Design a protein with these regions (language model features):
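Long, His/Glu/Asp-enriched segments that create or flank divalent metal/ion-associated functional microenvironments
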Residues: 1-170
Length: 170
């Protein structure tokens, strides 16, 4: 199989409280306590879930085979305790993004549809990464960011404004 079996674990799906919805990401996995990984929680932000596809790929990123799977599998290898306190952000997000990209091919879609959606998602992530470097490294202004996205056909100022503010906050 693509993903080795993991020990039995439990998962609770909770919803982001209404008061916090506009400030939080589409979903997030709460990493369990280092000494008790049997209880896992994923919070879903309902206002960010446009459709079943978004929900499916988000849960793949946050749950199985994403963050939840990676956490439970890693802990089942009995790692040196120091590995559980160190943060490897690129590795963790890289794995979850890989899992999310794989999830397009697990949906009831044709292989062509899955490939188009997966590649579109990859391009969007690449545009975010380029904008992040432009804003934080090259000092892009809001207008620079709007011009950057316009070159890729994204011309809605409100959308680019949201992206700009999101990147500034990260």
């Amino acid at each position: 199989t693509a993903f080795p079996e993991i020990p039995k674990t439990s998962l609770q799906i909770k919803y982001v409280p209404e008061e916090m919805q506009e400030h939080l990401s589409p979903a997030f996995y709460m990493i369990p306590a280092i000494d008790y990984t049997e209880e896992n929680v994923i919070y879903v932000n309902q206002i960010q879930m446009r459709d079943d596809l978004a929900l499916f790929t988000t849960l793949a990123h946050e749950g199985y085979p994403g963050h939840l799977y990676q956490t439970i599998f890693f802990e089942s290898t009995n790692p040196d305790p120091i590995r559980s306190i160190l943060n490897f952000g690129g590795y963790v997000e890289g794995w979850a993004t890989y899992a999310e990209m794989c999830s397009y091919y697990l949906m009831p879609l044709s292989k062509t549809q899955a490939a188009i959606l997966q590649k579109n998602s990859s391009v969007i992530l690449a545009l975010y990464a380029l904008a992040d470097m432009g804003i934080h490294y090259e000092g892009w202004s809001r207008m620079d960011t709007i011009e950057f996205y316009a070159r890729y056909g994204i011309k809605d100022a409100k959308t680019v404004d949201k992206i700009y503010n999101l990147i500034l906050g990260s």
